[in-house]
Amino acid sequence: MNVYQTIANFGTNILESLGLEAALSPTLSNTYIYGIPVLGAIFSGLITKKLTKSTAKSLIVQALFVILGTLAFLVITLASPAKPETGAFNQATLWIAFVVICFIMFFIGANRSIFWSTITELKVNKEIVGLAVGFISIIGFSKDVWLSPLLTGTTNQFIVKNSQGTSFYSQQALVAWAIFALINACLALLVTYMIVRKVKYGKVWVNPKFKKVFALGEQQYGH
């Protein structure tokens, strides 16, 4: 998921551009990259077992929360800096942004912990499971190759220096990251929705209104 890579790769830059002291960056980055997703994974396993009873259903609910988080992040980045001469936002905005980032990473960790289980629900032929996993991995992890150079090249033009000579990313870069994350969160929801339909109806785009008609036809004509 590109939302994860955006926050994992640029989360420190985002928070420091919002006014975070460099000394706190390692602690906070380890918290939202490694600590929070583990909690999300535990949460995802529990709700899948106790509530949704379906990996696909859990994924779509959690994907909606990721979208909610990225929307909140976009709103935060659109707020005007409290101190334009330094580029720093006020402390309240900084810590709200950190909480939102943790919220996003919580549900990303939740999704990443169970998404391979959809292979079972999709009833992928056991003979091609290895091939399917490999193909999915090529597509899914290829972003690690191109994402950082793409976003870095796009946002480096927005690097500025404050009156103390410290470099930080301007508001335009923060908004660009937020929009990119939101777009990818929406795409993730679309893919998850397709998985849910495939699990439920056997086909991605079958209109559920015709499902009963097809079932009656199969019973009547034996097809």
Swiss-Prot record:
One of its GO terms (molecular function) is transmembrane transporter activity. The chain crosses the membrane at residues 28-48, 59-79, 88-108, 128-148, 176-196. GO terms for cellular component: plasma membrane. The keyword Membrane applies. It is found in: Cell membrane. This is Uncharacterized protein MPN_113. It comes from the Bacteria. The keyword Coiled coil does not apply. InterPro entries: MFS_dom, MFS_trans_sf. Its main location: membrane. Keywords: Cell membrane, Membrane, Transmembrane, Transmembrane helix. It is a multi-pass membrane protein.
